[in-house]
């Protein structure tokens, strides 16, 4: 399916204070871009969290006792029921900011990358095996560049 007009219902939950965040409109654009060739419509939640919540969730669901940039929780509908629910993304604002600084990237460009990256995970993409990683990174690069940002995997 090629669809440049994906309809997105975004539930944005901000569970952290005093951080610089992209606008809801930017996040919706990034989600629509990530989903444009996969879904006509989608509903998802993006929850912005602090380091403690990110670390707790990463430890609980991935067995890694440290905060991470983005976690993806796909929604799986019961068999025979089709719903536009894609799932949830949990993004740690502090980790995204520090990574942007460490990688010498504009903060919004890194936010865009993390949202696109998380959406691709919700669609079933992964980067555990090298071949999967190459496919996912190639698609991410195309999507991020279509948004006007630099290749996220090249040093800035």
From Swiss-Prot:
Zn(2+) binds at residues 117, 121, 127. Its main location: cytoplasm. Coiled coil: none annotated. Binds 1 zinc ion. Keywords: Cytoplasm, Endonuclease, Hydrolase, Metal-binding, Nuclease, Ribosome biogenesis, rRNA processing, Zinc. GO terms for cellular component: cytoplasm. Single strand-specific metallo-endoribonuclease involved in late-stage 70S ribosome quality control and in maturation of the 3' terminus of the 16S rRNA. This is Endoribonuclease YbeY. It comes from Shewanella piezotolerans (strain WP3 / JCM 13877). The gene is ybeY.
